[in-house]
Each structure stands twice: as structure tokens, then as C-alpha cells.
Amino acid sequence: MLTFSPITESNAALFSQYYGICDYRLSDYSIGIKLMWNDMLASEYAIYAGCLIVRNKVRGRYAFDYPIPVTPDADIDAAFSAMADFCSENFIAFEFSGIPKKYAGEILLRFPNTETRRYRNLGDYLYLASDFADFKGKKYSGQRNHVRKFYAKYPDAIFRAFDEKDTDKLKAFREKVEAAFDKHSYGAKNEMERAWRMLKFVGSPMFRCAGFELNGEIISFCLSEKCGDTLIDHIEKALPEYEGIYPAMVQSFAQMFAWDVTYINREDDAGDSGLRTSKTQYHPVQIEEKYHFRIKNELYYIEKIPLIKTDRLLLNAIEETDIPAYNRLCLDDERNRWWGYDYRQDCAEPDEEYFYADQKKDFGSSTAMNFAVRLDEEMIGEVIL
């Protein structure tokens, strides 16, 4: 059975190595995303059959990433089986999130009874690194013009790598960016705050950090991470008063750091129309779709617990009026020891509605269906499917 442990700053270097060899080309498969959004994703991992298995919280429920082979003898089939067994044994929904399009078929082949969704707002923008380094051709004429204007207006601007010695300058840069920030949506503010959390990693070998400096002050900042053949740009920030600074930063960063990759991933647009326009204008070679899968079982198609009658007994849904009888049943240690489950493992001191609410949750997630067994309309037992 899988045993999961949290992904944290203390073990981040290990996952930087794993994601460094991952060829999925999605930002979801990077230590930067796991750290920036850790309080929301609550990412956990297990190593099984030579594969890195990661699960994250998505809309309040855990969903798996696509497994990553990390040893030469990795067995992805065994990893999938272990994930399925883990969900079955723990009565939780079996879901995947952030699955690359090229592996969507693998999920469907293994689990044909599947609900599939994808979200345009979450698609990552993928560009050729060589396009950004050169800005060649008619399609990049606008970017070239902005870059020329930037250097003509600010000839003393220097693009350079940042390290831990730049902490104070980056703090001053942060204050200026926040003072000029004019977006009021929760999503934009949330992304900004999470971006600043990554400043502590400037100088870390896990990331590539650089930006423009002018007259001793930092005026732009970019933080990226190499994952396989792709450079994933986690953060791009600049002071807006410097005309042309964004295309100049994009090009300079590619020239400095994209020498060993084929692609640059600038992540999603989160549905922001301004970001969508901007990222589209840089001519992505692909918008990498991400798929969410929920593996269905027979219970998925049952909307209501059915009524079953025998000559003597009646089986139907457990009702709120059954709570006293149901609690007596669930708290009967002498009987319950025979089926190997101790509720104290999940809740040491359950309140009056704990067991009733728990079985409703299991049915709602299609993991179990609990029947009350009734004799003369009185609940005398339980059957679980």
C-alpha cells in the first residue's frame, strides 16, 4: 500500500532532481509550482515501482499527477494499480488532475469508465526557446521594436543573474511593483503574493533567476526552472514605467538560460483576458492542455440508494432518524472487531452525527453504499457495498 509524505521546502531539492528529468512540459510537474501553491495543493508523494507518485488537493479532493518514472526499471502499470488500490482501501474517489494531453489516452485505456474534463484557462503556453532568443521574422516585429525602444531609452540597463546577495534590492523591487499594481481580482492578488514567496529561493540551484538592473536598482525579475527539455517560467515581474521591458526581459532571459532546452513554458493565463492577449502575441507553438479524470465505478451511476425487500427484512438508506441506532452499531467494539476496522483511527471522539455524515459522504463520492438492515422497520444492522 502507498504511504504518502508531504512535499516541503526541506525536501524540495530531491523533487527538483525528479522534475528535472520529467519530459511532460507542464508547469504542474515542477517543484516551483508545488512550493508556490503548497498551502492549497498540500502536495504529497510516494515512491513506488520506480515511479514518483504525487497527489494534490484539487477543489478540496485529492487527485493524482501522472506518475513519473525515476529509475531505469520503473513500472508505470504497477504504479497505476497501486494508486487504484490506495483509493479503494481508503474509500476515496480515484481522480487525476493536470494530465498532459499526450498521456490522456493512457488513462482512458487503463480506465475506460472515466469522466473527463479539461479547462482552457489552465492550459500552459509553450514556446520555442529559439524564437524567444532571436525574435526573428515578421511575427515578432512588434517585440523587436519594443526591445529596440527599451535599449535606446535605457542604454545603461544591464541584464544579469541574481543570487542571495541581491536580497535587499529584490525587496525594494517588490515594494515598487506592489505600489504600481492595479489589479483588484483575488486571483491576481493571490498570484502576486505567492510569487514573492519564491524570493527566498533566489540563488538556489533549483531555479534560474535574473532580471534588469538600472542605476543600481532592480527593475525586472524572472524565476524559472528547467524540467526536461523545457524551461518553466514561474515568475515574470517588471516595473511598468519602463517601456519595452517585458519583451526585452523575455529575450534576454532566453539568451542567458535557454541554451539547454527546446521549449519555454510561460504557464497558463488563468482566464485573464489581458494575460491571454499578451501570451498569444508571443506566438506559442502549442497551448498544452491539461486533463482531469475521475475514474467511475458502478456506484457512480446510482443516484439514490435503492429499496430492497425480502420476506422478513428491508434494506434501504440510513436516515437521520436512525442516528441513535446507527451509533450503537458503530460504537459496538465487541462486534466491530470481527471486521477489522477501528473508527478511532480516523476520529478518536466522534460526535453524534459523525457516522451518519461519514456514510453519506462515502455515497456522495461513489466509494461505498451503506444500507440499513431493518426488521419491522427498526434498524438492526448494516450492509456496505
Question: Positions of the model-derived regions?
Answer:
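Short, conserved active-site entrance elements at the starts or edges of catalytic domains
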Residues: 165, 169-217
